[in-house]
A protein has these predicted regions:
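Conserved, well-structured core segments that form or line functional sites
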Residues: 145-148
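Acidic, low-complexity central loop/insert segments
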Residues: 108-142, 154
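Hydrophobic face of alpha-helices
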Residues: 13, 17, 116-123, 239
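TRNA-binding/sensing appendages of the translation machinery
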Residues: 1-49, 272
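Short secondary-structure capping/junction motifs at helix and strand boundaries
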Residues: 25-28, 78-83, 128-131
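A translation/RNA-centric and nucleic-acid-associated enzymatic feature enriched
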Residues: 31-36, 43-71, 81-108, 151-299
Length: 299
């Protein structure tokens, strides 16, 4: 076991804390156990049954502190950040664990470009100085030779024209994410790359403007490090998205979050996988090399 990594991690996290404090962000803590689950697509929350006052009730371990922090922002509209453990069911591999450390931060009065600027400054502290910002459509054309379209039939026709194999029964999202995995392999350079302007179908909690989601993802050495967007504050739009996300899943919709959204001034938010960023900074190939990370056999 490389015990020096414990010291490196301590300094790494403290440097991040000091950076956000110096920028005027408030560090906050919110409960890991939540009454409502995060309803994100492709992420499965962990359910916990607790006995309280003689009655058993279901709670969820948060997959991110997003919902709780947004509820806090509704009553305390201030730039804020949190560093916390998060939990996701069914994730295990070189870059995935059911438990990991997340940095979540929110910035009032700015769109997602303000988050990118703060991330650039943060990355400067760890020796990253040269950055690339690339629109997702252009990335598909440059690296994969594919013209991306949100229309399923047009995308399939484009793939046939470029000689890509696919099952015609596959839907748009399945095809997109298969191609996206190929794109990730092309982003293996040392230069941090911000992919911006996502398809509106993939807006998540973000604003859609001029046909694109105001969303970005940060890649370093082919690893997704961060994910952020200009936050959508219209509860009806988010409700419709959440209904789609929880369809065929036994998950309730967080009504408290929907009530909070209109109370928040214009803002943007970002999540960062800290072990992954640590890997990029210290040239670590796998989460297996990080001694404190969750593993099947324990520490």
């Amino acid at each position: 076991m490389n015990y020096r990594l414990f010291y490196a991690w301590s300094e790494f996290v403290e440097k991040i804390r000091q950076f956000f404090r110096s920028k005027g962000y408030l560090e906050v803590s919110t409960p890991i156990l939540q009454s409502y689950p995060n309803a994100d697509p492709h992420i499965e929350p962990l359910k916990v049954n607790l006995t309280l006052k003689g009655q058993t009730k279901s709670y969820w371990l948060h997959t991110s502190p997003e919902h709780a922090m947004k509820k806090l922002l509704a009553i305390l509209p201030k730039d804020m950040f949190q560093i916390t453990k998060v939990f996701r069911n069914g994730e295990y591999g070189r870059l995935h664990r059911p438990e990991f450390t997340m940095l979540e931060f929110y910035k009032i009065g700015t769109d997602y470009t303000g988050l990118i600027e703060d991330l650039k400054e943060l990355l400067n502290l760890f020796g990253f100085e040269d950055f690339q910002i690339l629109e997702l459509e252009k990335a598909f054309e440059e690296y994969l030779g594919i013209v991306l379209s949100e229309e399923e039939e047009i995308l399939k026709n484009n793939l046939m024209a470029y000689g890509y194999d696919f099952d015609d029964r596959e839907d748009w999202e399945t095809i997109f994410y298969r191609l996206y995995v190929e794109l990730e392999r092309c982003l293996a350079s040392e230069k941090p790359t911000f992919l911006i302007k996502f398809p509106s179908k993939l807006a998540m909690y973000g604003v859609v403007k001029d046909g694109y989601a105001e969303r970005f993802e940060l890649y370093i050495k082919g690893i997704e490090i961060a994910n952020g967007w200009t936050e959508e504050r219209d509860p009806q739009k988010i409700r419709e998205r959440m209904k789609e996300w929880v369809k065929d899943r036994d998950l309730p919709i967080d009504e408290e979050l929907l009530q909070a959204l209109p109370e928040i001034p214009e803002f943007s938010g970002c999540s960062v996988g800290l072990e992954r960023l640590f890997m990029a900074v210290y040239n670590i190939e796998s989460l297996d090399q990080i001694p404190w990370i969750f593993r099947e056999e324990g520490l």
